[in-house]
């Protein structure tokens, strides 16, 4: 079986969850099953709940993980909704959670998915049943809407002019492919950054298509409300917007005191911590991993340990 995607930070994931003995492990973003396969091999008593919104990836992983079918439950779902579909008993026995918030190599390399700068299509939907694709956004959003998402999700300082250029071109003919869009944007780089403006525009469009920041926040909000007991959460991000969200939530969860910073003394009880941050700094790929898989270079993993704390 040819594997179309190399899992990032695999050794670091195995190390983070090395003490798992039994219970359930939730892979919120199963993809092509690399992380889950490794964990199932190393932990024979572990049961897996495997979730992905990409039908192609889920079907592939069902075949890949066939040897573990008695310990694996597959769910077609966006990761922000998966917690609503797990029974109370399983949530109580949840010992590990992984969310790898990135586009797979298969999605990037598959021409029809339209994620690649040189693709003949303009799609970018991780869930192929979703109604809005990159085509609708590029051809139907107003100049102001496009400018806003380029600034907000691409952190582009000239998003207005890029949006203006796109709107001028689409008046002549609809923009039908990623490579057309790439040619319109051009190959110039954003000031003080190594990536091209086109890459940042594509990032912004992809985030808008899949509502990536919104679904990440939804997942984190739901995790905050669940009384997880002795459970390790690992989240892998690939750009600063997502990583910033995860970092801030982890800091919030680790706080015992939630009083206003201007308060002279603690009045909240000083017992609100959900657990602890396992590593203060984000875990990044080794030089050796980046040499083997250059796409891993942007990956950052943060770990949080939910303790047994009854509120």
Q: Residue ranges of each PLM-predicted region?
A:
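S-adenosyl-L-methionine-dependent methyltransferase catalytic core, i.e., the SAM/SAH-binding region
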Residues: 1-311
């Amino acid at each position: 079986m040819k594997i179309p995607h190399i899992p990032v930070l695999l050794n670091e994931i195995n190390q983070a969850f090395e003490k798992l003995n039994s219970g359930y492990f939730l892979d919120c973003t199963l993809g092509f099953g690399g992380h889950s396969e490794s964990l199932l091999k190393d932990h024979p008593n572990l049961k897996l709940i495997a979730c992905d919104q990409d039908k192609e990836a889920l079907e592939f992983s069902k075949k890949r993980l066939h040897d573990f079918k008695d310990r694996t439950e597959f769910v077609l779902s966006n990761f922000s909704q998966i917690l609503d579909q797990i029974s109370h008993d399983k949530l109580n026995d949840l010992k590990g959670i992984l969310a790898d918030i990135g586009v797979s190599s298969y999605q990037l390399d598959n021409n029809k998915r339209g994620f690649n700068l040189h693709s003949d299509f303009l799609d970018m939907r991780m869930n192929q049943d979703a109604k809005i694709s990159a085509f609708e956004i590029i051809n139907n959003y107003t100049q102001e809407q496009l400018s806003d998402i380029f600034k907000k999700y691409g952190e582009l300082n000239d998003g207005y002019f890029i949006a203006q250029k796109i709107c001028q071109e689409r008046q002549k003919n609809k923009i039908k492919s990623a490579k057309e869009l790439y040619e319109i944007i051009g190959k110039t780089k954003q000031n003080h950054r190594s990536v091209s403006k086109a890459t940042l525009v594509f990032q912004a469009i992809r985030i808008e298509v899949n509502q990536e920041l919104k679904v990440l926040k939804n997942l984190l909000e739901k995790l905050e409300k669940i009384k997880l007991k002795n459970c390790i959460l690992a989240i892998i991000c690939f750009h600063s917007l997502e990583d910033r969200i995860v970092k801030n939530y982890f800091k919030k969860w680790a706080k015992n005191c939630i009083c206003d910073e201007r308060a002279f003394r603690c009045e909240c009880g000083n017992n609100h911590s959900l657990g602890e941050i396992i590593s203060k700094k984000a875990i990044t790929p080794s030089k050796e991993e980046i040499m083997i898989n250059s796409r891993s270079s942007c990956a950052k993993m943060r770990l949080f340990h939910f303790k047994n704390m009854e509120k």
